[in-house]
A protein has these predicted regions:
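N-terminal helix initiation/capping motif
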Residues: 1-45, 111-117
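Short, surface-exposed secondary-structure edge patches
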Residues: 16, 53-58
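Residue-level preference for beta-strand/loop junctions
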Residues: 17-19, 34, 60-62, 75, ...
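Short conserved beta-strand and strand-loop elements enriched in small hydrophobics
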Residues: 23-30, 62-74
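A residue-level detector for short acidic-glycine micro-motifs
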Residues: 27, 44, 83-87, 97
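Short beta-strand-centered aromatic/proline hotspots
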Residues: 38-40, 77-84
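Short, solvent-exposed secondary-structure boundary/capping segments
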Residues: 50-54, 89-97
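Short solvent-exposed strand/turn elements
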Residues: 58-60, 93-112
């Protein structure tokens, strides 16, 4: 008996689970093309990256500094990232070069958000 393929949400078919996180997301280019800080909104976060919406943006492969708030600390998180995807105004950033403390903070954030789902 053939079964039709079930639709699986893109949030489920990822290397890391995604968790909804709505907060201000600030990004600035690293390197030669400085445009200042761009402000957007985050959509979701995982241990590997964060997705957000911006009215203007970057090409895939662009290195950026990301700054955003998380529910497990009172100070903003600042992490280096790379644009891995974008569709219209939505951008996917992969975290790169995480220090152990940053990695633990993102992991703790994801564990906390998982409990809130």
């Amino acid at each position: 008996m053939n079964r039709p393929e079930e639709h699986v949400s893109p949030l489920i078919k990822r290397r890391y689970p995604r968790y909804e996180l709505e907060t201000e997301l600030r990004a600035s280019n690293l390197g030669a093309k400085q445009r200042g800080v761009m402000r957007g909104r985050s959509l979701n976060i995982s241990e590997g990256g964060i997705a957000g919406v911006f009215t203007t943006g970057w090409d895939v492969g662009t290195s950026v500094n990301l700054e955003f708030s998380v529910p497990v600390t009172s100070y903003p998180v600042s992490i280096e990232g790379v644009v891995r995807s974008h569709t219209d105004y939505q951008y996917g950033f992969e975290f790169v070069g995480l220090m152990p403390g940053q990695r633990e903070l993102i992991s703790k954030t994801c564990r906390t958000l998982a409990l809130l789902e």
